[in-house]
UniProtKB/Swiss-Prot annotation:
It holds the Pfam family ER. This is Enhancer of rudimentary homolog. Keywords: Cell cycle. Belongs to the E(R) family. May have a role in the cell cycle. The keyword 4Fe-4S does not apply. Homodimer. It comes from Aedes aegypti. PROSITE patterns: ER. InterPro entries: EHR_sf (IPR035912), ERH (IPR000781). PANTHER family: ENHANCER OF RUDIMENTARY ERH (PTHR12373), ENHANCER OF RUDIMENTARY HOMOLOG (PTHR12373:SF0).
Length: 103
């Protein structure tokens, strides 16, 4: 369980920057999925159930001006930065585990 800070900048304007903190990397990846789900709900307010494919989630991540994580490293007592590609890899692993497949 490594404390993780998610940095999000949806648009080009630096004023759109926000951050969230989580108790673990997996919790943070779930947070990224929730951000996308909220985005879908805003775009489709009359749709009772939101469904999406991982490629749609990754397209959303790619279109954000910036998305990165700072993950606490206990051994050095510092935070290490990670980019969108790393985040997508972690989301992929998380969703595979949730689906019950392990290859």
């Amino acid at each position: 369980m490594s404390h993780t800070i998610l940095l999000v900048q949806p648009g080009r304007n630096p004023e759109t920057r926000t951050y969230s903190d989580y108790e673990s990397v997996n919790e943070c990846m779930e947070g990224v999925c929730k951000i996308y789900e909220e985005h879908l709900k805003r775009r489709n307010p009359n749709t009772p159930t939101i469904t999406y494919d991982i490629s749609q989630l990754f397209d959303f991540v790619d279109q954000l001006a910036d998305l990165s994580c700072l993950v606490y490293q206990k051994s050095t007592n510092t935070y290490a930065p990670y980019n969108k590609e790393w985040i997508k890899e972690k989301i992929y692993v998380l969703l595979r585990q949730a689906a019950g497949t392990t290859d």
